[in-house]
């Protein structure tokens, strides 16, 4: 079982969020110590909270991360809002993050554990996607493939 962070990580309409930061995850994951009680590490959801250090969150819970969504965001100048960006152009340093992920996967492989499943999250709507009759916002085929190719390029470059 994996727990995805609140998306977005801020209260909406006065309804508080459940899990948006290191402290929230620590409370939940420490409440029942099991590899089955894990985290869906969503870089976009976590990075959209300006108080989060996603690299520290990853390092803290790396053994409990069961799935990864790779998405990038940019915090607005007002520090109160954010928007999604292309995978390589936001505030998240994907080279740094992917190095951490690969290091953890290497550790797991020594212990005969599986790789961490991951995927690009929320690809952008590119020209070809705009003419499709039915698209799911954030899940366009070509936009996600572009994100996947960028992420695979980083993996290849740092490996």
Located regions from the model:
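Helix-loop segments that flank and shape redox-cofactor active sites
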Residues: 7
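Histidine-acidic metal/acid-base catalytic patches
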Residues: 10-159
């Amino acid at each position: 079982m994996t727990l995805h962070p609140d998306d977005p990580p801020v209260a909406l309409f006065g309804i508080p969020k459940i899990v948006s930061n290191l402290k929230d995850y620590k409370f939940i994951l420490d409440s029942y110590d099991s590899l089955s009680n894990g985290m869906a590490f969503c870089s976009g959801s976590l990075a959209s909270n300006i108080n989060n250090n996603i690299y520290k969150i990853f390092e803290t819970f790396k053994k409990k991360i069961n799935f990864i969504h790779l998405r990038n965001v940019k915090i607005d100048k007002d520090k109160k809002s954010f928007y999604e960006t292309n995978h390589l152009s936001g505030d998240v340093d994907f080279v740094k993050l992917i190095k951490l992920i690969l290091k953890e996967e290497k550790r797991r492989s020594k212990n005969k554990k599986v790789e961490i499943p991951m995927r690009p999250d929320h690809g952008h709507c590119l020209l070809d996607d705009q003419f499709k009759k039915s698209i799911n916002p954030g899940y366009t085929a070509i936009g996600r493939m572009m994100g996947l190719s960028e992420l695979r390029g980083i993996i290849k470059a740092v490996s």
